[in-house]
Amino acid sequence: MTASRDPYPSRIVCLTEETTETLYLLGQEHRIVGISGFTVRPPRARREKPRVSAFTSAKLDRIVELEPDLVLGFSDLQADIAAELVRRGIEVHVFNQRSVGEILRVIRTLGGLVGCERAARALADTLESGLAEIASAARGLPRRPRVYFEEWDVPQISCIRWVSELIGIAGGDDVFPELAREPLGKDRILADGLEAARRRPDVVFGSWCGKKFSPRAVAARPGWQDVPAVRDGELHEVKSSIILQPGPAALTDGVRELHRIIGEWVQRHA
């Protein structure tokens, strides 16, 4: 009797890190034939898989040479890449998760795409439980700091929805909740950079999309000298790889780092 052929995609290219990390966590890394050059999680992925894309660009000919039966992308920023690959006859699935709930749904969906629905549900449930534990601990904090999270410095861009939600889970309050609902970065640009100072954040998180955050530069901005976060030295970098990647990293290391810093702020200001 001949063994049945695996009916699921066996040559997957991941254009962003979160799908790579998720497939590794599901034990499905053998299906991956190409990854993003920005991938750092898990570290061994960079050693094991060829890097075929940046974030808004890709080595299209190289991807075609890999003969993928599925390419996984993310958001409108990769729409042009996806369209060109489709024109070349390649199947593409583009996720568009912007919230914590949508990140969990993507994990479950990805499990279905590769035939490991049960493992994916278990992973998502574990991540959800971890978030609930942090939220429970945060509810016990005597104070909640006002938090400004900056994704980019020039122009100043405030945080996307999943980051805003994770700030809330971790024990803080995003000072720009109305902007967090905007899915596109261009719609989260602060028309007046001083508005962030006027909202008087107690804590500033900087995660400049791979560029090193400079607390000194933020503190030196005109009009910022009386901001509580500047006055108290509460300007903190959070690595982009653990918070701006809408996948397992943000729901584990990212939110834990936010919670740790917020907890330390509470201790200093109790």
How would you name each of these model-derived features?
Residues 1-270:
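N-terminal ligand-binding lobe of clamshell/alpha-beta domains
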